[in-house]
Amino acid sequence: MIDNNILVKGNKEGINIVININKFKDFEEMLEALVKRLSVGKMFYKGCNLKIITDLKNINEKQSVRLKQVLFEKFLIKDCIFEDSNEKPSKIFSGIYEGRTKFLRKTIRGGQVVNYPGNIVIIGDVNAGSEIYVGGNIVVFGALRGYAHAGFGGNSKAIVAAISLEPEMLQIADLVTRSPDNMKPQYPEVAKIRGNIIIVEPYLPNKFI
């Protein structure tokens, strides 16, 4: 389950982490919860710019330095800044950032990891043993056989679509499913969340997804 006191949202600058620090008994409890939350998809944060949005009056300078150190060492982030949640309404990314989409014209081979905060379109196959972590949608013009995590950070409106949808594991937000064994799709399919489960439907060009 996702801790609602720590929200992770992608935007065009990087990743926002919104922490309701008043819900934790102390800094140590918050830090432990944050590390646990981010460890779900650790490689997603490598090389990312992070913005920590929280009530800064509850974090002293020594604690902020320690927090940064943990993020740099454990998650290999590129940069980390702080924003006081009480100063102004934070510009949090909600839903899918439709204007930011990355196109990859290649096969993603086993052992490769792809991280992106927006949507990603892959023109080629995603082989078994590969991993994809994105903040928005995943669309594959080929076979998707690796691990795919769309809506990373809790975006339950994200979708995963492929010409041949047969992933080792598929995750949207915090929900996870697997492909049925020995079931090769006969048509393009779309996976999305409906209610509290991931459903897979045939792709219909004229149907809104």
UniProtKB/Swiss-Prot annotation:
Pfam family, any one: MinC_C
Key word Cell division present: yes
Source species, domain of life: Bacteria
Cross-referenced InterPro entries: CAP/MinC_C (IPR016098), MinC (IPR013033), MinC_C_sf (IPR036145), MinC_N_1 (IPR055219), Septum_form_inhib_MinC_C (IPR005526)
Keywords: Cell cycle, Cell division, Septation
Purpose: Cell division inhibitor that blocks the formation of polar Z ring septums. Rapidly oscillates between the poles of the cell to destabilize FtsZ filaments that have formed before they mature into polar Z rings. Prevents FtsZ polymerization.
Annotated HAMAP family: MinC
Assembly with partners or alone: Interacts with MinD and FtsZ.
Entries under PANTHER family matching the protein: SEPTUM SITE-DETERMINING PROTEIN MINC
Name assigned to this protein: Probable septum site-determining protein MinC
Lineage of the organism: Bacteria, Bacillati, Bacillota, Clostridia, Eubacteriales
